[in-house]
């Protein structure tokens, strides 16, 4: 377990170390969207457990952790923002980098975890390296539009259903592009 002191929570996780003498290169695995446990378990499959096992057998130390408010981690998942999840990942990275068994430390982020990896790489406490697995390679608004269109198609809804709410979503995107996050959050709270 490690602390995110800025959030006042403890996050539970598993650190796997390779056999032999360290220090070892090390990674933090950061999950995609949705409340995920440290194995990123979905429908009985545990991709982060499999990835951690492979990396560890190949000489890389791996920290994987339960998202805040999920499984054994403290916090409230439902009210957390992308910045909160980035803060959790940064705390994990600091904890891992401080361990005597580790050398260069980085992030492997899956999907939304890839976005978090980009955020940390551009921040003040940048990891030594990042890997983005299925993280977006286009601007977030473009990604959201395409994701929404694909979800509508997969649900079997007609094109008219997609277009029906398109204007509202485009307006929301325009607002978030135009105004700083704190301004939008304050004004949304005033509507509640």
Where in the sequence are the language-model features?
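Short glycine-enriched nucleophile-adjacent loop
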Residues: 114-125
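Conserved alpha/beta-hydrolase
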Residues: 50-72
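Alpha/beta-hydrolase fold nucleophile elbow
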Residues: 100-111
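Short, surface-exposed "cap/lid" segments of acyl-processing enzymes
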Residues: 20-54
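Alpha/beta-hydrolase active-site loop
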Residues: 79-99
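Accessory cap/linker subdomain of secreted extracellular hydrolases
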Residues: 133-192
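N-terminal cap/lid segment of alpha/beta-hydrolase-fold proteins
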Residues: 1-22
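Residue in the alpha/beta-hydrolase core beta-strand immediately N-terminal to the catalytic nucleophile
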Residues: 106, 129-131
């Amino acid at each position: 377990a490690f602390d995110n002191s800025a959030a006042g929570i403890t996050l539970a996780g598993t650190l796997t170390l390779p056999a032999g003498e360290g220090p070892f290169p090390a990674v933090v695995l950061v999950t995609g969207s949705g409340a995920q446990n440290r194995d990123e378990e979905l429908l009985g499959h545990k991709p982060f457990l499999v990835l951690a096992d492979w990396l560890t057998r190949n000489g890389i130390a791996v920290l994987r952790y339960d998202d805040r408010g999920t499984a054994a981690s403290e916090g409230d998942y439902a009210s957390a923002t992308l910045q909160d999840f980035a803060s959790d990942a940064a705390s994990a990275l600091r904890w891992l980098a401080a361990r005597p068994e580790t050398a260069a430390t980085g992030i492997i982020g899956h999907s939304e975890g890839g976005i978090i990896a980009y955020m940390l790489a551009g921040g003040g406490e940048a990891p030594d390296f990042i890997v983005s697995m299925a993280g977006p390679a286009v601007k977030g608004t473009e990604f959201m539009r395409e994701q929404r269109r694909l979800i509508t198609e997969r649900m079997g809804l007609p094109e008219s259903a997609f277009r029906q709410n398109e204007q509202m979503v485009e307006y929301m995107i325009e607002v978030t592009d135009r105004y700083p996050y704190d301004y939008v959050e304050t004004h949304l709270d005033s509507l509640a």
